[in-house]
Amino acid sequence: MWENYGMTFIEYIFLKKYRNEKNHVAIFGNKNLLIPIEENKPVIFISGHFANFELMSMEITKRNINLATIYRPLNNFFLNPLMEYLRKKYICKNQIKKGISGVRDAIEYIKKGYSVALMIDQRVSEGENIFLFGKPALTTTLPAQLAIKYNLKIIPVSIERKMNEKFEIVFDKEINPQNFRNKIELSQKLNEILENMIKKNPHQWIWTHDRWKQ
């Protein structure tokens, strides 16, 4: 994990290069990626902190999909402004800070026709206990709530670092919120999808905290 973490940090230097080039990423599930354009309706993109996770949102915006991303500011007071600058300039200009105000911002973006991307693998103290690998884990239910309230499809996205500075990004089959009874049931489905991502690529999951802390 730490090797991948270090490589991801170094790669912030090359975000401009990644923004302007195409041959470093292979995209699978392009049909799913383009659902917001084909259906002229926002979606919720969900993923976890794998490989260089920043490239997922970058590739979405490179397809001219209107996107806003929800992020957690870094604890480092000095480094955080630089990271925010780089994200807005090269990844996605619409950055939403995690929190109550961020939820309101996400809703406003959705009403304007923007898709929303967020990570679901971090512990959220105000979240619900949703099972992850058989153990209850405080988990955000925001993607489920937004999907149910606004009838938005959820698109799982995963990324894997390959050899020679190459990446593979997979946009998986959409999830219809109408197939679930409530936010808990839908959130459990999302955690199961996250489990499969982790099982497939455990060494590239950036996991630096106690995910199951209560």
Where are these regions (language model features)?
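Alpha-helical membrane-targeting segments
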Residues: 6-10, 78-79, 112, 149
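Catalytic core of membrane glycerolipid acyltransferases/transacylases, capturing the structured
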Residues: 4-7, 39-99, 125-130, 135-136
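General small-molecule cofactor/ligand-binding pocket signal
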Residues: 26-28, 96, 172
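Membrane-anchoring hydrophobic helices of lipid-metabolizing enzymes
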Residues: 1-47, 82
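Non-catalytic C-terminal accessory region of glycerolipid acyltransferases
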Residues: 34-39, 62, 100-214
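Short acidic/polar alpha-helix capping motifs at helix-coil junctions
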Residues: 20-23, 47-49, 68-71, 106-110, ...
